[in-house]
């Protein structure tokens, strides 16, 4: 993520990115390392590229101190983002993960603010849809079982789970709903036809 953040902090790239998001109805998605970059840039949770302090959220080493690669359940906690327009709050999806540094950390005050603002978009959950801290549920030990967050306007979304690693014919012998479609085709298509 360090290379990605260095690239985006270039003034021309930074200005073009902010123009895309603020003036041209653009969307941005970061998955796994991309999520790490979005956090280190400030795009999530703040919606702007800005300097980061020790008090800002971060993604750090999993609590079990090793890489995890498996399937987990995540629940939609907020669908205010155009990226999640095809989902309902409470929907549960099975998502592949593969990371060693996926634990979302921030202050209790900030995580409550994110929840109150509807910026926590997905959480790791058990088979009943309940967020938890057990490693079998929350593979990295993220505070409040956070798997993904978004910017205040929902245009920027970051998540750890690899929704893009799901395709027809995969995971045939594993129960779960895999059809999350994080990219809102409906939103993108509506935008395209309005031009």
What do these predicted regions represent?
Residues 38-39, 84-85, 105-106, 158-159, ...:
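Short helix/loop capping segments that flank catalytic or ligand/cofactor-binding pockets
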Residues 68-152:
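Catalytic beta-strand/loop cores that center a nucleophilic Ser/Cys/Thr
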Residues 35, 100-102, 163-165:
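Glycine-rich beta-alpha junction loops
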Residues 30-32, 96-98, 160:
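Short beta-strand segments
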Residues 146-174:
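A glycine-centered loop/beta-turn motif at secondary-structure junctions
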Residues 1-80:
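Cysteine-nucleophile active-site neighborhood
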């Amino acid at each position: 993520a360090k290379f990605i953040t260095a690239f985006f902090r270039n003034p021309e790239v930074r200005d073009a990115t902010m123009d895309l998001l603020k003036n041209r109805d653009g969307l941005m998605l970061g998955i796994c390392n991309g999520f790490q970059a979005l956090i280190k840039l400030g795009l999530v949770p703040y919606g702007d590229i800005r300097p980061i302090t020790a008090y800002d959220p971060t993604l750090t080493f999993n609590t079990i101190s090793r890489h995890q690669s498996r399937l987990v359940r995540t629940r939609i906690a907020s669908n205010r983002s155009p990226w999640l327009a095809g989902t309902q709050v409470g929907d549960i999806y099975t998502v592949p993960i593969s990371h060693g540094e996926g634990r979302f950390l921030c202050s209790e005050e900030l995580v409550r603010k994110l929840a109150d603002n509807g910026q926590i978009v997905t959480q790791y959950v058990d088979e009943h849809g309940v967020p938890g801290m057990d490693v079998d549920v929350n593979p990295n030990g993220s505070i409040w079982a956070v798997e993904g967050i978004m910017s205040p306007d929902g245009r920027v979304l970051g998540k750890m789970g690899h929704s893009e690693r799901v395709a027809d014919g995969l995971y045939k012998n594993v129960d779960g709903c895999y059809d999350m479609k994080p990219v809102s085709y409906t939103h993108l298509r509506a935008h395209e036809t309005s031009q």
